[in-house]
Amino acid sequence: MKKKLYIKTYGCQMNVYDSGRMADVLAPLGYEPTDAPDGADMVILNTCHIREKAAEKVYSDLGRLRPLQAARAATGGRMIVAVGGCVAQAEGAEIMMRAPHVDMVFGPQTYHQLPEMVARAVRGTGGVVNTDFPVESKFDSLPEEGASPAGPSAFLSVQEGCDKFCTYCVVPYTRGAEFSRPAARVLAEAARLVADGVAEITLLGQNVNAYHGDGPDGTTWGLGRLVRNLAEIDGLARIRYTTSHPNDMDAELIAAHAEVPQLMPFVHLPVQSGNDRILQAMNRKHTADDYRRVVERMRAARPDLALSSDFIVGFPGETDQEFADTLRLVTEIGYAQAYSFKYSARPGTPAAAMDGRQVPESVKAERLEALQQLLTAQQTAFNTACVGRVQPVLFDRRGKKPGQLLGRGPWMQAVHAEAPERLLGRIVEVRIADAHANSLSGTVVVGEHVHAHPVAPETASAEAGV
């Protein structure tokens, strides 16, 4: 008998990938994905612990599930409620205490054991908590991906965990030590995805450019070598990777940006702060100038490269002048996109124990607004610089308007255009006509093959007057 499975995914692309693999693990038990929790036989909340608000959202959602679970029980049925991901890893016991109707709690390294957990939950032997780091890698036990990809783009996990131990971050504690999948398995999974119609693969890892997987030739492969071998898969038109660390941006990977046309000219390279004292307090293990030099080398290899980044404002002890150093770095680098946040203390991290140095919320809010104004101006200028130029766009879904398709260009901008549905899944030249805050729109080019690039982000910053 078929059963309905509803998975709600919070946070990063790695969680999106993990949710798909959870569905693969549960498929042999008869579970099929459904789009809503109402009527589901199992609900999994695949959680994120990066920010406090994300964690509290989980408890709010668990409260909304309780009456659904009770209603099912009243009719003689059962809804299994499970919490997975990083909140589960960090707060397993607290989840069971605050939400005793939860049947299962499991971390991101143990979801391959879901069949055993489900059996225990069904037997009714109490809440199941499985947050230990297993000796065996989950990748050794996961089945091949089951359902066909939902579109022409797919995520592929190649690396997990982090050994950097930034003082504000919970990832080393929730995801564990760095682990790289063997290159042969990555290549085989990528080949299967391409055979199923995928044209673009994004390689995932908490610290993806720290990838050092066992190669089929007996040597250790870095991410650059992995990218080169992926590019040899016939039909794989685009390769991306995220998230990267400046210290792991080695010469081999930078050279791949210059020499592998399938590797897209867009990189997410977090820096967090532009001030050296704050970077040291964060345990980032690099200076602002180290970051500048990495960016310079990358742009020398690929002049049309665009960057996005992460920034934290109001880190404990941050002064006005130290925040000004971040604004200066942003102005110098120029970003096509960026993500910025107020510092949020995560329990158990060293930064949370920096008593007496916490920045007032009002100051954090002022700094965040100033930074976001600068970043928005840069993004607007970058998008505006694309107008009149032609981009190859991978159409991956229908747009909101009839007859409209939506896709992404090389620099990750969403691009809208009127186009027939037969172009879904194809890379098509689009002449950009209009730039919007978070997207572009244009017209499909017929009989023209121009791969012009937008101006470099530095120029975009100057045009924005920042």
From Swiss-Prot:
Start and end residues of each MTTase N-terminal domain: 3-123
UniProt-listed Enzyme Commission number(s): 2.8.4.3
Keywords: 4Fe-4S, Cytoplasm, Iron, Iron-sulfur, Metal-binding, S-adenosyl-L-methionine, Transferase, tRNA processing
SMART domains (alphabetical): Elp3
Catalytic activity: N(6)-dimethylallyladenosine(37) in tRNA + (sulfur carrier)-SH + AH2 + 2 S-adenosyl-L-methionine = 2-methylsulfanyl-N(6)-dimethylallyladenosine(37) in tRNA + (sulfur carrier)-H + 5'-deoxyadenosine + L-methionine + A + S-adenosyl-L-homocysteine + 2 H(+)
Enzyme category, top tier: transferase
CDD domains, per database record: Radical_SAM (cd01335)
Chain residues that bind [4Fe-4S] cluster 2: 162, 166, 169
Co-factor note (free text): Binds 2 [4Fe-4S] clusters. One cluster is coordinated with 3 cysteines and an exchangeable S-adenosyl-L-methionine.
SUPFAM superfamilies in alphabetical order: Radical SAM enzymes
InterPro entries the record matches: Elp3/MiaA/NifB-like_rSAM, Methylthiotransferase, Methylthiotransferase_CS, Methylthiotransferase_N, Methylthiotransferase_N_sf, MiaB_methiolase, rSAM, rSAM_horseshoe
Every Radical SAM core domain range: 148-381
TRAM domain location: 384-446
Example of a GO cellular component annotation carried by this entry: cytosol
Main location: cytoplasm
One Pfam family here: TRAM
Role noted for this protein: Catalyzes the methylthiolation of N6-(dimethylallyl)adenosine (i(6)A), leading to the formation of 2-methylthio-N6-(dimethylallyl)adenosine (ms(2)i(6)A) at position 37 in tRNAs that read codons beginning with uridine.
Subunit structure comment from the entry: Monomer.
HAMAP family in alphabetical order: tRNA_metthiotr_MiaB
Family: Belongs to the methylthiotransferase family. MiaB subfamily.
Protein's UniProt name: tRNA-2-methylthio-N(6)-dimethylallyladenosine synthase
Gene giving rise to this polypeptide: miaB
